[in-house]
């Protein structure tokens, strides 16, 4: 499956803000955005004022980069969001939040969504007792996500268990059992990503 293989820190510089794509490193002085907060490239330091289209496009790119989704997947997710009841932009964020890789990240099994995606792809998780290694798998309310028995002894998972993460309202966790549960669909106020989804809807509505 296609994925972005370029320099991760350049993505934050391109969007003009920290997207926290590299986990703990983003909170330190080693973060590239701290040292060079302007866009990459020869003319990056002199940002031009964006047109309405440019602003909408940047918002879409930002959302794609935060969730680690490429254009085709993102477009398909938006088309699904449009067909759902409710507000298309909020539906889009809800669908992105309920990807398995994002849920694993929200449960604290990964310092970043990138790391969580790798853990899913390597087969470390069960959903309702069945192994799922597809990062884009959509979880549902009442689904139970569990770390595979053979993975629990690794130092990485022990570290996650010893340093539990604050959870959003729509998730519950049983740290001792290496288990998390989706107890509700995320509401917009539960989604703490710096994205204006209305701009994305406007872009796709053209």
Curated annotation (Swiss-Prot):
Gene Ontology cellular component annotations, sorted alphabetically:
small ribosomal subunit
Q: Which UniProt keywords apply?
A: Ribonucleoprotein, Ribosomal protein, RNA-binding, rRNA-binding
Residues covered by the S4 RNA-binding domain? 98-163
Q: Which GO terms describe its molecular function?
A: rRNA binding; structural constituent of ribosome
InterPro entries, per database record: Ribosomal_uS4, Ribosomal_uS4_bac-type, Ribosomal_uS4_CS, Ribosomal_uS4_N, S4_RNA-bd, S4_RNA-bd_sf
PROSITE patterns found in the cross-reference section: RIBOSOMAL_S4, S4
**Domain of life, source organism:** Bacteria
Q: What GO terms in the biological process aspect are recorded for it?
A: ribosomal small subunit biogenesis; translation
Q: Which SMART domains match?
A: Ribosomal_S4, S4
Q: Does the keyword Membrane apply?
A: no
Please tell me whether the keyword Transmembrane is annotated for this protein.
no
Query: Sorted alphabetically, which Pfam families does this protein's record hold?
Result: Ribosomal_S4, S4
What is known about its subunit structure?
Part of the 30S ribosomal subunit. Contacts protein S5. The interaction surface between S4 and S5 is involved in control of translational fidelity.
Q: What is the similarity comment for this entry?
A: Belongs to the universal ribosomal protein uS4 family.
Q: What does this protein do?
A: One of the primary rRNA binding proteins, it binds directly to 16S rRNA where it nucleates assembly of the body of the 30S subunit.
Q: Know the name of this protein?
A: Small ribosomal subunit protein uS4A
What organism does the record attribute this protein to? Clostridium perfringens (strain 13 / Type A)
Q: Lineage of the native species?
A: Bacteria, Bacillati, Bacillota, Clostridia, Eubacteriales
